[in-house]
Amino acid sequence: YYEGQDGRVRSEMTITDDKGRVRHRQMIILRKDMSETDALENNAYRDEQKLYVYFIHPADVNKMGFLVWKKLTTDDERWLYLPALDLIKRIAATDKRTSFVGSDFYYEDISGRNVDEDHHELIETTDNYYIIKNTPKDPSSVEFSNYKMYVHKETYIPVQVEYYDKKGNQYRVAKTLKVDTIQGHPTVTKASMENLKTGGKTVMEYDEVKYDIGLTDDIFSERYLRNPPQQFLY
């Protein structure tokens, strides 16, 4: 869920395992909509996105970069830059539901899942939420049988997402913990992902949020994974 045509945010990731051991990650996230608009209605009808993540702390991930080209009709493209090896690694579509830098979030959680990959069913409406059941069109490509999403009626922000395994047991839950209004946009500033099977939990906190800062398309390229766009990072 994103507002504005582009944006920048600083994020602090806190990863806690089942024994209470804590690790931290700090990163800058840049995002740009690649929307085309209808000349008559001036409404976006194609909403592809590009995402750039630059890690700043701790030392073992410093200067690491993650790039996503989010597609609507084909698989997203993802790359990871490993500075210690000066290596740009393409992340296969089959790996999109694996751990993102050792956290409880998956790569796909960070970049977002394509709506066309699932069947969607409105199963309940409450005073505040639309409750939607989402079932994968290709069950063999994912580890879940379905996921249930609670979408806030006023902001359309998913406040909770529950994932169910092939046996129908809930095993992951994502929560929106805090929403602030920034530049007139309702913005998630704290979120979590909990793995009920492993006992791990990751919290993401977002600050220094800025919208419509004029990001250029060329930033979202392999070149800038090696040579980060400093003017937008600090």
Label each PLM-derived region with a short phrase:
Residues 1-84:
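N-terminal mature ectodomain segment of secretory-pathway/periplasmic proteins
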Residues 4-6, 48, 115-117, 127-129:
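Sequence-level motif detector for i,i+2 pairs with an aromatic at +2
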Residues 5, 26, 49, 160, ...:
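Residue-identity detector for glutamine
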Residues 28, 124-125:
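Residue-level signature of transmembrane alpha-helix interfaces in integral membrane proteins
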Residues 30-32, 178, 226-228:
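A generic membrane alpha-helix/interface feature
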Residues 67, 71, 77-81, 87-115, ...:
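Gly/Pro-enriched, hydrophobic low-complexity segments
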Residues 119-121:
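Conserved catalytic alpha/beta cores of large enzymes that bind or transform nucleotide phosphates
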Residues 214-234:
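Gram-negative outer-membrane assembly/targeting C-terminal domains
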